[in-house]
Amino acid sequence: MLYHTIIRKRYDHIMNENDIWLIAGLGNPEAKYDGTRHNAGFAALDALADKWNISVGKTKFQGLWGQGEVDGHKVVLLKPLTYMNLSGDSIAPMAGFFKIPADHVLVLCDDITQAPGKLRIRPSGSAGGHNGLKSIIARLGGENFPRIRIGIGAKPHPDYDLAAWVLGKFPPEDAKAIADRYPDLEAAAKLIMDGKLSLAQSKYNG
């Protein structure tokens, strides 16, 4: 019995060597963008890196990255430094380098259609007007990659300039609403890596 247990553990280890995920948080580099709505993906990735004790400090393919293991999954964390609209120029070559298929590329980004702190988990889909997602879709060659969109709140009125809104800083109450959801975001990311995206949706969407 012990022999079979050892063999099974070795087999599981071999299988897990091919289980690798790229998790990318979207945002803009430069300190002046810290704390802005459009950098919600960067902030969420930093929260995961802290929780998982993964240092995101190496540079490759126009991005800051680090790697580790989370619940048996190999994980590469990435913050593209290309600016938002060219996020795919960092994500696609990083995925290619590690031979990570698109359905194992999990993207964290902001969502102006959701209230601050709301999460929207999707297995695939269009860019929905998000230029970062648009770039990733173009560079990966399709829409079939999961994403967790983080609510940042809608413009206060239709005439408000969109760029000014997403590049504006969060008020403290909105920043807290988002930070309070980081435990849910982490749990959702783990479920997605476990192949349980539908469960992540039912538990954490909204």
Residue ranges: model-predicted function:
Residues 2-124, 134-148, 155-161, 168, ...:
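Nucleotide and nucleotide-moiety/phosphate-recognizing core
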Residues 128-132:
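Hydrophobic alpha-helical segments within soluble ligand-binding/sensing domains
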